[in-house]
Amino acid sequence: MDDTTLNFFDGETLTKMSRNEDSNTNIRRYTKADFDREVFSEDKDNADKLLSILQYKQNIILQGAPGVGKTYTAKRLAYMKMGYKDDSRLMQVQFHQSYTYEDFVMGLRPQSDGTFKFEAGPFYTFCKKAEVDPTKEYFMVIDEINRGNMSKILGEAFSLIEKDHRGEKITLKYNNIQFGVPKNLYIIGTMNTADRGLVQLDYALRRRFAFITLLPAYSSTGFRAIMARSQNVKFNRIARSIKDLNIEISKDDMLGPGFMIGHSYFCLGHKVTDEDLSNIIEYEIMPLLDEYWYDFPDKVERWHEKFTKILNG
């Protein structure tokens, strides 16, 4: 392999990275007050707790039921930690079952002409970007982190994400270059606890992350404000019924709290209308209940009748 293949970042590129020349010039301050306003939680100390565990572990996974806003929270936690809404210091990727070391770190990648080219992946690239800008914090958000095999995806870099090994160097197998995960890089993963088709995370990965469970927040100040702005009595009744539904789901021996219905289904960015409610219930909530209780159609029908009565009332 020639020298040009090994040299992913020349001096000019590194200088641009350190100056953030590709960053958004409209960067604005982002405070805990912004986080509390945008991220719904029934825990008034939510922001402080998340910041504390992120600082302590440096690698965290936000886990929870569908619709609790895991990715939304992850990005705003990054903004709050850096103090700015600066997307140039945040990278978001999504794992899937076919995601590989070559996709994430580096490797030979097929080209349109049938040849292969040696390319750096997003993790390698982002680590290098953070490394040349050590006075600022950088954040990698990994959606659906449990859909990929983390140890295979990271390869020999797997040990380097651990906080105690930040800054250490190892030799990468593809190019014999020394590589390390910088101390100013934070990793925030998200994980859907209601996905039956995924294997459990191995203990080696669990030891490198702190796990934080996000819960539905229908009683939070932020969600109550959405209901108040909508001025829709049916919306209020549906929300109360979803809270009752979540109690039933959490007590179900085959399901549990990890399968509850999150509040973000109803966070539409505008006043929630009767038509919105009908679409959410009919095409999002009910298909989910069909999946949850596929062996108990009577339960599904009972809830469908209850929601229909509210919507038609």
Language model features with spans:
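Amphipathic alpha-helical segments that form the core helices of the histone-fold
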Residues: 266-268
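Short beta-strand-centered aromatic/proline hotspots
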Residues: 1
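AAA+ P-loop NTPase catalytic core and its hallmark functional loops
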Residues: 8, 12-255, 271-283, 287-313
